[in-house]
């Protein structure tokens, strides 16, 4: 009887041990699952929000998606700006894109449902527009900027025998904000002709031609896709008719033509770099779109003085070199996990209420807090600087930095530089200085504000240690 009890007791103990082990295994499995799911969610979040420090105001090259990619070139489009409420509605509908074409590459005719403003980063080419019943052919080269209206049928080619043709562009969709499409009249499988969507009866009536002949023309299978290569003699023929002005244009102020930023005198230059700009007064199409283009060549180890734009939001694309940018922002920090948790917690009205509680004190006064947004930048980094946000861009010690800037909302905009010889803070009158800084500190404030003898482009923060994302 004792043996039976002992045996029964041992069996119960073994069963209990087995159940406990299974519980621990289940908990461990769930923990691993939760951990992996959390890692996946964080990774997805990083991919959606640029993957680097400074988001949503900074997006790296990994945020571009290939629309077209062949051995003859690529067309890549930056993902939509991740947090439109923070970045601002001013640029939420715009898209940034990069085009690269190999030597003697040819781009098939197409049109966008978006206005296109582009800057030639490198190389040379020919761009042909079919619009308003005529053909316009333009020679473009490095440093040129140009506007192509939505709906214009465009084809182009790299006219150089050994250099790549590289273009940075800003697209302003006219149908759906933030979304645009490219339409090809002639194609096969890739790209497909948009005529393939129409019925045979409609096409035969429209072109007064039999279906078989239409298919041979508009749905002919071509090798190479949207970007192909062309024989040298055909490239030469395309180049013969192109001009710097509008071939066949009226010569009016509304004439479409390329304008060279680097071929004109910089609006500011010193030992620390050069700044160029193309305004709406010089290009009526830019004024119509409420845009402006700027180019900053910053000497290595130099910086742009902290500044802001009164009305325009700046979209800056790094063309060459490396460095970092800093910005004072009242909306979010430039950080990572805490920012993600905040976005996850705040939804709809609850988010507005929580933000209202953060922004106002016990007496209903707004608590003014500014966060530092900071990120390293390199080629194809994109920076968003909203209107009135003080910011600076610094070139690294090792190489100069070239940045093209698209200013959205540029009509009636002004640039305000906060440090240096042209700082408006130097214009404070004496009574105001005593009230702002305190009577005893007014003279010290004068010394601080007058200590920088240069303006706009300045010597950078040398010897301050390495820069890292924060």
Curated annotation (Swiss-Prot):
Gene Ontology cellular component terms for the protein in this record: extracellular region
Binding residue positions for Zn(2+): 347, 352, 360
GO BP annotations, alphabetical order: proteolysis
Glycosylation sites: 297
EC number(s) per entry: 3.4.-.-
Protease keyword on record: yes
Region of interest: Disordered: 36-59, 240-261, 330-368
Residue stretches spanning the membrane: none
Residues of the signal peptide: 1-34
Ranges for domain Cupin type-1: 57-215, 259-445
Family, as annotated: Belongs to the 7S seed storage protein family.
Function in brief: Seed storage protein. Globulin-like protein that acts as a zinc metalloprotease. May play a role as an initiating endopeptidase in germinating seeds.
Description of how the protein assembles with itself and partners: Homotrimer.
Identification of the protein by name: Cupincin
Organismal lineage: Eukaryota, Viridiplantae, Streptophyta, Embryophyta, Tracheophyta
């Amino acid at each position: 009887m004792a043996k039976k009890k002992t045996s029964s007791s041992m069996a119960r103990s073994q069963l209990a041990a087995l159940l406990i082990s299974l519980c621990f295994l289940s908990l461990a499995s769930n923990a691993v699952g939760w951990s992996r799911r959390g890692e996946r969610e964080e990774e997805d979040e990083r991919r959606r929000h640029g993957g680097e420090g400074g988001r949503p105001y900074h997006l790296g090259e990994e945020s571009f998606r290939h629309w077209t990619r062949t051995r003859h070139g690529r067309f890549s489009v930056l993902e939509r700006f991740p947090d439109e409420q923070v970045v601002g509605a001013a640029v939420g509908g715009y898209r940034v894109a990069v085009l690269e074409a190999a030597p003697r590459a040819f781009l098939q005719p197409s049109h966008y449902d978006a206005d296109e403003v582009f800057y030639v980063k490198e190389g040379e080419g020919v761009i042909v527009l079919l619009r308003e019943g005529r053909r316009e052919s333009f020679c473009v080269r490095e440093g040129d900027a140009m506007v192509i209206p939505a709906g214009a049928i465009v084809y182009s080619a790299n006219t150089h025998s050994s250099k790549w043709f590289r273009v940075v562009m800003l697209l302003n969709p006219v149908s759906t904000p933030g979304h645009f499409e490219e339409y090809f009249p002639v194609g096969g499988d890739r790209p497909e002709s948009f005529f393939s969507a129409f019925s045979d009866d409609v096409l035969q009536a429209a072109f007064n031609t039999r279906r078989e002949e239409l298919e041979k023309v508009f749905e002919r299978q071509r090798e190479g896709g949207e970007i192909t290569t062309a024989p040298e003699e055909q490239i030469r023929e395309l180049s013969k008719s192109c001009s710097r002005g509008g071939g066949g244009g009226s010569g009016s102020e509304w004439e479409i033509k390329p304008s060279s930023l680097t071929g004109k005198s910089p609006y500011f230059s010193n030992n620390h770099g050069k700044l160029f700009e193309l305004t709406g007064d010089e290009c009526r199409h830019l004024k119509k779109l409420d845009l402006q283009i700027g180019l900053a060549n910053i000497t290595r180890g130099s910086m742009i003085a902290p500044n802001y734009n009164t009305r325009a939001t700046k979209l800056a694309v790094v063309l060459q070199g490396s460095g970092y940018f800093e910005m004072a922002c009242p909306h979010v920090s430039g950080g990572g996990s805490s920012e993600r948790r905040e976005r996850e917690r705040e939804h709809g009205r609850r988010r507005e209420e929580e933000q209202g509680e953060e922004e106002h004190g016990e007496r209903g006064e707004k608590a003014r807090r500014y966060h530092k947004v900071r990120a390293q930048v390199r080629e194809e980094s994109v920076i968003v600087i909203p209107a009135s946000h003080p910011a600076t861009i610094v070139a690294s010690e090792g190489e100069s930095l070239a940045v093209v800037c698209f200013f959205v909302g540029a009509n009636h905009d002004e640039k305000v530089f906060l440090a240096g010889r042209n700082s408006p803070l130097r214009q404070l009158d004496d009574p105001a200085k005593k009230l702002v800084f305190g009577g005893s500190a007014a003279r010290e404030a004068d010394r601080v504000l007058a200590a920088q003898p240069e303006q706009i482009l300045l010597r950078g923060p040398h010897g301050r240690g390495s820069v890292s994302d924060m």
